Amino acid sequence: MSIEILNESGHPLDVKRLAALSRFVMDRMRVHPLAELCIKAVDEPTIAQLNEQWMEKAGPTDVLAFPMDELRPGLVDEDPEEGVLGDLVLCPDVAARQGETAGHGTEAEIELLTVHGILHLLGYDHAEPEEHREMFGLQDELLAAWRAR
């Protein structure tokens, strides 16, 4: 897997841990081993501009996902598709506030947002209650497995 992480946020980021988490999630979701992922950490003005440009929402957000080849999780009895999974844009400053509010800190929030973003890249959504249950359940399961290893 090719995982590129760019930190343009001005916030310290454990790039190796983030890459390992991404690889873990992609492996668990049976993403093709040659799939590509780019994660960019940016500041609040940058993510606010992207949020407005692409989501038509004002202000900063925590994570944006830009799927490329519309890859989906692999099935047990099928070979996964090769391609570019997509790009994630994270905002560590927003993550820091959310992590503090949630009581689990910045690093745990960045991990959560990374898993959340990868699931979006794989086609998961949470607009409807059933989708929400499925996506957040899977997100919790992946994070628990990551932290238990």
Swiss-Prot record:
One GO cellular component term noted in the UniProt record for this chain: cytoplasm
E.C. designation(s): 3.1.-.-
InterPro entries the UniProt entry points to: MetalPrtase_cat_dom_sf_prd (IPR023091), YbeY (IPR002036), YbeY_CS (IPR020549)
Cofactor comment: Binds 1 zinc ion.
MF term (GO), any: zinc ion binding
Signal peptide location: none
Swiss-Prot/TrEMBL GO biological process terms: rRNA processing
Binding positions for Zn(2+) per the UniProt entry: 116, 120, 126
Keywords, comma-separated and alphabetical: Cytoplasm, Endonuclease, Hydrolase, Metal-binding, Nuclease, Ribosome biogenesis, rRNA processing, Zinc
Subcellular location(s) per record: Cytoplasm
Cofactor(s) demanded: Zn(2+)
Superkingdom per UniProt: Bacteria
Family statement drawn from the similarity comment of this UniProt entry: Belongs to the endoribonuclease YbeY family.
Function: Single strand-specific metallo-endoribonuclease involved in late-stage 70S ribosome quality control and in maturation of the 3' terminus of the 16S rRNA.
Protein name, UniProt field: Endoribonuclease YbeY
